[in-house]
């Protein structure tokens, strides 16, 4: 059934939004996995766990915001299967942070692609929505993760348990 409120909202934009929702669901699921991995008794890095669980919550808010916009524009949300996280054992903090950075770059590229599609379809509402709620936050998060990776390497690299502990205590407790 077609929406009575749909106006200037192309079907390819609608499909791209549904794909982005799926990517955000997958990211939230991955960050939840990361968060609870670092909460395990044999890993026990509370600050790292908290950092990733906060990201899971932010991604949840992101996909809900996208779904709400989809409904407001007269689009239809089509849910897809969510892929299992790539790992069950995430290793040390630098490995997990690198995986998270790759995920954020993938999300950022998907947002940029959707913005370009919105521009090509002359959809200023979509472009403004993405600029207001997503694009700037993604860039800030990628920068923050890059800073965290730099500090982790300064503290002794991926094999330095004390460096990982100090990073967790001194950096992530202040976020």
Swiss-Prot record:
PANTHER family: FERRITIN, FERRITIN LIGHT CHAIN. The modification N-acetylserine is found at residue 2. The lineage of its organism: Eukaryota, Metazoa, Chordata, Craniata, Vertebrata. Fe cation binds at residues 54, 57-58, 61, 64. Stores iron in a soluble, non-toxic, readily available form. Important for iron homeostasis. Iron is taken up in the ferrous form and deposited as ferric hydroxides after oxidation. Also plays a role in delivery of iron to cells. Mediates iron uptake in capsule cells of the developing kidney. Delivery to lysosomes by the cargo receptor NCOA4 for autophagic degradation and release or iron. Residues 7-156 form the Ferritin-like diiron domain. Keywords: Acetylation, Cataract, Cytoplasm, Cytoplasmic vesicle, Disease variant, Iron, Iron storage, Lysosome, Metal-binding, Neurodegeneration. InterPro entries: Ferritin (IPR001519), Ferritin-like (IPR012347), Ferritin-like_diiron (IPR009040), Ferritin-like_SF (IPR009078), Ferritin_CS (IPR014034), Ferritin_DPS_dom (IPR008331). GO terms for biological process: intracellular iron ion homeostasis; iron ion transport. GO terms for cellular component: autolysosome; autophagosome; azurophil granule lumen; cytoplasm; cytosol; extracellular exosome; extracellular region; ferritin complex. GO terms for molecular function: ferric iron binding; ferrous iron binding; identical protein binding; iron ion binding. This is Ferritin light chain. It holds the Pfam family Ferritin. Residues 54-61 are annotated as: Catalytic site for iron oxidation. It is linked to Hyperferritinemia with or without cataract: An autosomal dominant disease characterized by elevated level of ferritin in serum and tissues, and early-onset bilateral cataract. Cataracts may be subclinical in some patients. Neurodegeneration with brain iron accumulation 3: A neurodegenerative disorder associated with iron accumulation in the brain, primarily in the basal ganglia. It is characterized by a variety of neurological signs including parkinsonism, ataxia, corticospinal signs, mild non-progressive cognitive deficit and episodic psychosis. It is linked with decreased serum ferritin levels. It comes from Homo sapiens. The keyword Iron applies. It comes from the Eukaryota. Oligomer of 24 subunits. There are two types of subunits: L (light) chain and H (heavy) chain. The major chain can be light or heavy, depending on the species and tissue type. The functional molecule forms a roughly spherical shell with a diameter of 12 nm and contains a central cavity into which the insoluble mineral iron core is deposited. Iron enters the spherical protein shell through pores that are formed between subunits. Mutations leading to truncation or the addition of extra residues at the C-terminus interfere with normal pore formation and with iron accumulation. It is found in: Cytoplasmic vesicle, Autophagosome; Cytoplasm; Autolysosome. Belongs to the ferritin family. The keyword Glycoprotein does not apply.
């Amino acid at each position: 059934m077609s929406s009575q409120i749909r106006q200037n909202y192309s079907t390819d934009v609608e499909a791209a939004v549904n794909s982005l929702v799926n990517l955000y669901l997958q990211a939230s699921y991955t960050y939840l996995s990361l968060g609870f991995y670092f909460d395990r008794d044999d890993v026990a890095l509370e600050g790292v766990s908290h950092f990733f669980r906060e990201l899971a919550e932010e991604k949840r808010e992101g996909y809900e915001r996208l779904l709400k916009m989809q409904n407001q524009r007269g689009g239809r949300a089509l849910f897809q299967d969510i892929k299992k996280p790539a790992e069950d054992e995430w290793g040390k903090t630098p490995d997990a942070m690198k995986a998270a950075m790759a995920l954020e770059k993938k999300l950022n590229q998907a947002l940029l692609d959707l913005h370009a599609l919105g521009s090509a379809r002359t959809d200023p509402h979509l472009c403004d929505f993405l600029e207001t709620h997503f694009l700037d936050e993604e860039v800030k998060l990628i920068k923050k993760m890059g800073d965290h990776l730099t500090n982790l390497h300064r503290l002794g690299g991926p094999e330095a348990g004390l460096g990982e502990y100090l990073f967790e205590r001194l950096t992530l407790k202040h976020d």
